[in-house]
Structures are given as structure tokens and as C-alpha cells.
Regions:
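Extracellular acidic, Ser/Thr/Pro-rich low-complexity tracts
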Residues: 64-66, 104-106, 183
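Exposed regions on extracellular, virion, or secretory-pathway luminal proteins
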Residues: 79, 166-168, 184
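Beta-strand-rich binding/interaction modules
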Residues: 71, 84-159, 164-176
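Short acidic/polar inter-strand loop motif in beta-rich domains
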Residues: 177-187
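Amphipathic alpha-helical substructures
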Residues: 5-7, 11-100
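Long, contiguous hydrophobic alpha-helical segments, chiefly transmembrane helices and signal peptides
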Residues: 62, 114, 181-183
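Terminal edge beta-strands and adjacent linker/stalk segments
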Residues: 186-194
Length: 195
């Protein structure tokens, strides 16, 4: 979308055209799952080989394969300087349950994969879909119990949910513990509960 001669430095052009393009595809894995992304790439190649596709073509192919709505993703990723930054804002206990409040600090919305590790060594996964995607991603960790929470509306800066367990039973809470989301400040993605 931005012509190469509009960049002041070649290195900036390289980052915007190559690195950001690579991250676009890796974020698709985070958004729609690995299997859907691989199917998308195969179908995209089959449909557009020897042609001149546009950015909308990869987005439309991913939408057809997965069923997710991805207009917002293409717009945020290619036409803005919005960043992805989520954090754990607060962890509190009430009535033998633990309330967890997450916050969207950056302007780019994303669905959230969150893992709670308990003091007994077990782990539980929570998935917070993004409302404007109209989609629920396949479970990337089928060996772990997964709870799908209500959708997070993109305009809401915070999201709070409860776990029906005491805070004393929780060891660590992590947003995207595998590091697949392009969060610019991953150090605020985990919360360790010290005794």
C-alpha cells in the first residue's frame, strides 16, 4: 500500500514489507488456528498461482476456509500503526473465586489464549473470542481443559472473568504463554502469585 520510495530508509521498507508480512501470516495461526492457516495457504496458492493477488485475496481466502471475519485484522495490520499489547491488570479473590481482569493497552484487538497454572501442577486454558471475528478457534492445546468465555467487544478496554477456585490455589496466570501473539510488551502478560 505504501510505495517503497516513500520510506526514508531501505531498512524501514524491508521491515514493513518483509517482516510485517511474515508476522501477518504467523498471526493468522494465532487467530484461526494452525490447521485453518495451512488450508488457507494451500487454497490461496491453488487459486492465485500465476496471478497478481491483492492483500484482500489472502484475507478472503482465510475467511472462506475458517469462517472467521477478518476485515478488521487486514485493516489494523496493513493500514494503521496500531500495536498489540495486552496485560493482566488485576487478580483478586471474592467468595472463594478468583477474579481476573485483563486490559487491552495497545489499539489492536485480538482474541486471547490464557493459561492458569495451579499449585498442584495442573493447568487450565481459557479462550476469549474477539466479538467482531464471529469465530471460535480450535483448541491449540487439546491435552488441557479449555473453557471458552464470552466474547470480548473490541471497544471495551478491559475484560473480567471469574475462576471458581481460591486465589491461593493459583500459581501463575499467563496470556499467550507460547508467545504466538505479536504483543509488543510481553512482560505484562503473566502474573505469578507469591505466597
Amino acid at each position: 500500500s505504501t510505495h517503497s520510495d516513500r520510506f526514508d530508509l531501505n531498512s524501514v521498507y524491508s521491515i514493513c514489507s518483509y517482516s510485517k508480512g511474515e508476522l501477518f501470516l504467523s498471526q493468522l495461526i494465532y487467530l484461526i488456528g494452525k490447521e485453518n492457516t495451512m488450508k488457507t495457504l494451500k487454497r490461496y496458492f491453488d487459486e492465485f498461482k500465476f496471478k497478481h493477488p491483492t492483500p484482500n485475496d489472502i484475507k478472503r481466502t482465510a475467511e472462506r476456509v475458517s469462517g472467521a471475519e477478518l476485515d478488521w485484522y487486514l485493516t489494523d495490520w496493513t493500514q494503521t500503526t496500531n500495536t498489540i499489547d495486552y496485560g493482566i491488570k488485576d487478580v483478586s479473590e471474592a467468595n472463594s473465586s478468583t477474579n481476573i481482569t485483563l486490559e487491552r493497552i495497545g489499539r489492536m484487538p485480538m482474541p486471547i489464549d490464557l493459561v492458569v497454572e495451579y499449585v498442584d501442577g495442573t493447568k487450565e486454558s481459557f479462550y476469549i473470542p474477539l466479538r467482531m471475528m464471529f469465530f471460535e478457534k480450535e483448541n491449540p492445546t487439546p491435552e488441557m481443559k479449555r473453557t471458552v468465555l464470552k466474547d470480548w467487544a473490541w471497544a471495551e478496554p478491559t475484560f473480567t472473568f471469574s475462576i471458581p477456585k481460591s486465589k491461593s490455589l493459583i500459581k501463575k496466570i499467563s496470556i499467550d504463554p507460547n508467545g504466538f501473539m505479536a504483543d509488543i510488551k510481553p512482560e505484562n502478560n503473566s502474573f505469578e502469585i507469591t505466597k
